[in-house]
Amino acid sequence: MEKQKNVGHIVQIFGPVIDVQFPNEHMPAILSALEVKINDESIIFEVAQHLGEGIVRAIAMSMTYNLSKGLEVYDTGSQISVPVGKQVLSRMFNVLGQPIDGGKPLDSFIKNPIHAKAPTYLEQKATSEILVTGIKVIDLLIPFIKGGKIGLFGGAGVGKTVLVQELINNIASKHGGLSVFAGVGERSREGNDLYFEMKKAGVLDKTALVFGQMNEPPGARMRVALSALTMAEYFRDYENQDVLLFIDNIFRFTQAGSEVSTLLGRIPSTVGYQPTLSTEMGQLQERITSTIRGSITSVQAVYVPADDITDPAPATTFSHLDAKTVLDRGIAALGIYPAVDPLASSSRALEPNIVGKKHYLVAKKVVQILQRFKELQDIIAILGVDELSESDKQVVARARRIRNFLSQPFFVAQKFSGIQGQFIKIQDTVNNFDELLSGKYDNIPEEAFLYVGTIDQALEKAKKMGWSEKN
């Protein structure tokens, strides 16, 4: 901060936004960081607009309780920058890269600005390697691509955060790479729980966490994903690592952008969102990619307002994703978790030349049976199962077993469910569903397939329920 020369004064304050008067010849650049010092406390702002006559409009990255007109504002001469490199691992940061875990201050470290250009087309690298998650419904029907972007779509309370936490647990412990978690506009309690869960699981030393929670100003929530991405990019570009970037929740990034847009006086677009929605989303998503040096695989939870998948916020996110995992309230209501809707979800990796012919055919047969089961729902509701043809009765019975078998006990939920978490190998998943489709287990009670990892466990559960092979 010794290089600060440019000094302005606050001329207007409205919530988390301030107008600052600078000398005409020394106006700070757009995206520059400004600093206000009050009683040994430093508040950082980011320049968003030039209003003319030396006045700039800036957005706060922290609360603005003690501000008053006339206070001095210092132009730092650079963008907001965050620490990068191995020192950020096992630590928790805010949007400015300041540690918030109560640990010791960082020693000497490198800082990178949070705004950067996306890798050029020539720098990017296409890959078709599958990232095994150990979660049956995902590995079978919606396989994730290493270096791809994955979206977890769902309304409130259907299990997005739990699924993200399970993916962190499974991939970080099995994959062995580095992870960066961005908590964007979600609950502080969830961030706290995640930190201690990761510490307990022994994966914290390979993870950096960055939080801009729902109680923070929109500026912090809008920029925290960029702060986390900057840390991930350093590991990819300078350490040649394969990095996992988890964002919970990408909708809050859009929501914060909408709040900031309104504060800046922009005319809203469709459903009240900012007119720059597609641009802002693109600037973030285009930086999340694989290059010739390393990869970033991104898993993003996407809140769906009022369960409306056509809402502009989730719809804009859709176009950037390689796999779409849709969580359904109806499936959650049946007590089946993860509440993934296999018919609404999709992945561009589900191709025979990527996953193999057997995997592809088994997945397609599973989807066909579930689709036919869905078509029969209205008939069943009106006339009952007894009025169906024998072939349709078989479809219904098999589909119910498949639906139950797509459930799975999670490691991160075992303290609540009392059921040991399961990591299932992808080959076991494919073989188990192949046997299930063949009708080999049509005589086993459908309840036995709920919350088990493999067919063998389902058989054990059935025997405990009083079923025997003579039945």
From Swiss-Prot:
Alphabetical list of Gene3D superfamilies matching this protein: 2.40.10.170, Bovine Mitochondrial F1-atpase, Atp Synthase Beta Chain, Chain D, domain 3 (1.10.1140.10), P-loop containing nucleotide triphosphate hydrolases (3.40.50.300)
Keywords, alphabetical: ATP synthesis, ATP-binding, Cell membrane, CF(1), Hydrogen ion transport, Ion transport, Membrane, Nucleotide-binding, Translocase, Transport
GO CC annotation terms, alphabetical: plasma membrane; proton-transporting ATP synthase complex
Reactions mediated catalytically: ATP + H2O + 4 H(+)(in) = ADP + phosphate + 5 H(+)(out)
PROSITE patterns assigned to the protein according to its UniProt record, in alphabetical order: ATPASE_ALPHA_BETA
SUPFAM superfamilies in UniProt: C-terminal domain of alpha and beta subunits of F1 ATP synthase, N-terminal domain of alpha and beta subunits of F1 ATP synthase, P-loop containing nucleoside triphosphate hydrolases
Matches recorded under Pfam families: ATP-synt_ab, ATP-synt_ab_N, ATP-synt_VA_C
Enzyme Commission designation: 7.1.2.2
Subcellular location: Cell membrane
Function: Produces ATP from ADP in the presence of a proton gradient across the membrane. The catalytic sites are hosted primarily by the beta subunits.
Similarity comment text for this entry: Belongs to the ATPase alpha/beta chains family.
The protein's name: ATP synthase subunit beta
Organism: Mesomycoplasma hyopneumoniae (strain J / ATCC 25934 / NCTC 10110) (Mycoplasma hyopneumoniae)
